[in-house]
Design a protein with these regions (language model features):
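Terminal, low-structured helical/coil segments at or just beyond the last alpha-helical repeat
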Residues: 135-205
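TPR/TPR-like (Sel1-like) alpha-helical repeat modules
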Residues: 54, 102, 110-137, 163-167
Length: 205
């Protein structure tokens, strides 16, 4: 009887672990699908994937050096569909969870700027861009994996030009959005470069 009880308990625990693992796997798949939709200009589709994933695990972060939040991407998706109210609410949650989420701060600033709160919006955009620049400086200083990030300083130079210039409102926000997209793409490019370097003949493995 005792053995039967132990077997039942073990089976239940295994089922619980597997269910949790399956749920985490699905969240990861939805986040990647949502990011892909954003990167290909389909924010409405991104909201479907990212919204579902955020309901399951609102604290999920990308398993990369940048560790971007699912809420950051969902907020960006709402921003790109023109829904400032939802974008602001979600991005505020992202920043409440991580005040150093510079991509979230960038899109939060863009949302405020487009909502006619331009003074505060500009400050938040500047803070987001400066934070991204500092983060890239820090990560590229690492002797092991720093070489894979922004190797030609393309993103950092774009940030410097945007912050140093005095572009018209439309040009400024367009430049800031472009940098946000570049940073997101850099996450994938850097990871792919690191993987290729690790597993090629003579690599780190």
């Amino acid at each position: 009887m005792m053995n039967a009880s132990r077997t039942l308990i073990s089976t239940c625990l295994l089922a619980f672990v597997l269910a949790g693992g399956c749920a985490s796997f699905q969240v990861g798949r939805d986040v990647q699908a949502g990011r892909a939709a954003l990167q290909t200009g389909h924010p409405e589709d991104a909201i479907i994937y990212l919204g579902r994933a955020a309901e399951s695990d609102p604290n999920y972060k990308l398993p990369t050096r940048a560790q971007e939040s699912i809420l950051t991407y969902l907020g960006r998706a709402y921003y790109e569909t023109g829904d400032n109210t939802k974008a602001r609410a979600v991005l505020e949650r992202a920043l409440a969870n991580d005040n150093n989420d510079y991509l979230a701060r960038l899109y939060f600033g863009l949302t405020l700027y487009r909502s006619n709160d331009r003074e505060r919006g500009r400050k938040e955009i500047d803070a987001g861009l400066n934070g991204m620049h500092a983060w890239l400086d820090e990560v590229t200083s690492d002797s092991v994996y720093g070489i894979y990030w922004d190797p030609n300083r393309t993103i950092r130079l774009a940030i410097e030009r945007t912050l140093a210039g005095k572009p018209e409102a439309g040009e400024f926000t367009a430049s800031a959005q472009r940098i946000g997209r570049q940073f997101d793409s850099e996450i994938d490019r850097a990871r792919q470069s690191e993987i290729q370097s690790t597993y090629q003949p003579g690599g780190k493995n």
